[in-house]
Amino acid sequence: MMNEIEERLEVDREKIKNAIRLQMPIEITSYTIPRNMEVYIQRVLELFLDECHQEHLRDALSFCLGELLTNAKKANTKRVYFEEKGLDINNPKDYEEGMKDFRDETFDNINYYLEMQRRAGLYVKIVLQLKEDKIFIEIRNNSLLTDSEKLRIKDKLDSVQQYKSMEEVLGTVLDQTEGAGLGIIIVILMLQKVGLSKENYQVFTEDEETVTRIILPGNGNIFAAVEIMSYELSYMIDQIPVVKNHFEIINALVASPTLERQAIKQAIREDIGLALLAQKYALEKDSSAVGIKKCLSLLSDDELRYIYSDSNPSIRIVENSPVLENMVFHAQRTAYFAYNMFKNYQEEMNMADELNADVMYALGLFNSIGFALIETQTEEQRSYMEELSQQYEEDWKKIMDVFNFGNTANYIKRIYAKKSQMPAFATYIISCWNSRRGKLPERFMFAVDVLYMSEMMQYYDEKIADFYQIDRKILKKYGILDEKMFKTMITKMKTSLDND
């Protein structure tokens, strides 16, 4: 069984990398958490921390996770035990009566009670997620805390400061009501050993689940280095990369004595760089210009001939590659999905005046700016990025790994958009599509949701994202209640694109 688990994890490592890169959750759900599942969960945690470059926290967090899984499973066992005994777990007298024999009876017949948990639909869910520069580890179960349980948790958290070591706790604390009753206190002490505190530990109720959350800082050195390198690269770039075959198409179109603007518009819609060029020159005339249609309306035929000519120093032609081809295809699909979702749902949503379907198409393309700029770095730029990373000595290889393959694209996209003087609302939207939503004005939330859904549809279709990783609240806004409905939406969008 161990070999099967390890093999499965080896296959899933790419999923873990993608989840971190796109700041998606990793979830594992179990009704009984058998031994092989515990091993699997611990291995996923180790790989997750490795990919977050926080491997030094492995031992401490593995211990904490084991304690919290036991607590969550015990909470579920307690519910079915009380129900079988005909006791009300929310009644203080019944609670006291039930807990007298709970530990002994369930320990002696645990498989029976675990099967009851399965039949009752009581689960334990582990959620791991990187959000910006913080790591979230959550244990969720669908047994809501009673008032007495909430009080006991509060008392334990308040008492932590009395103890300086686990030995001291083990020698002085014994709460027979909760078994050993040491789990929470020991978890906090373990967190303190790695420089954290009880402020990094939360217990609360959300969406009919009890949530225990540990919040960790990301690797500060790596995040600081990556942010500096993102600024440096963004400001080094003084030319817009355009895929060679796409440039040849539009270059031929603008060489015609009479410009076919519809054909030019379609060519621009196929390439991030071509769209950025149109916007660059349109912004010189109108600082609010976003959207290919709007940008083209501001540019004369002669200006288009110059913009897409060999003599324009703002252009850097790049050779196509499988990675770049996939990236451009992803951006095209995302843009098309965003365009159609906007048209389909705009009447139902409150939104900003600056938004329209053409703008959403452009934002769908521009959401891949960061990935495109990383992939099309010049040799000089790559060399300079490596030189910068080496200033961090022993961490430099990790920094380069995060810079080239991590979530750096979000930093670069945000910085480059500001540098290019993209309108603030557009910068907000492409910066907040999968994070930082609290910083977004409400009137732009519809556009962010559309962009998020469009990206996730494409990532799902590419088998990079799983359905469970998509925000349920956003799915619900669009009437998507299950995976079948989500697949149907994607199929309709793809069919529409093929027929366009």
PLM region spans:
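Non-catalytic interface/linker regions that flank or bridge core catalytic/transmembrane domains
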Residues: 1-12, 158-175, 184-192, 198-307, ...
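Short beta-strand element(s) in the Bergerat
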Residues: 22-26, 124, 133-137, 210
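Helix-loop-beta hinge of the Bergerat
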Residues: 22-54, 147, 153-166
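Conserved short strand/loop->alpha-helix "switch" segment adjacent to the catalytic nucleotide/phosphoryl-transfer site
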Residues: 42-66, 89-90, 172-177, 351-352
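Conserved ATP-binding N-box helix of the HATPase_c
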Residues: 53-122, 127-130, 183-193
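Flexible ATP-lid and adjacent glycine-rich G1/G2 motifs of the Bergerat
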Residues: 104-120, 135-136, 143-202
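Conserved alpha-helical "signature site"
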Residues: 224-366, 372-380, 401-405, 415-426, ...
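Divalent-cation-assisted or electrostatically stabilized phosphate/pyrophosphate-binding catalytic cores
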Residues: 293, 382-415, 439-448, 465, ...
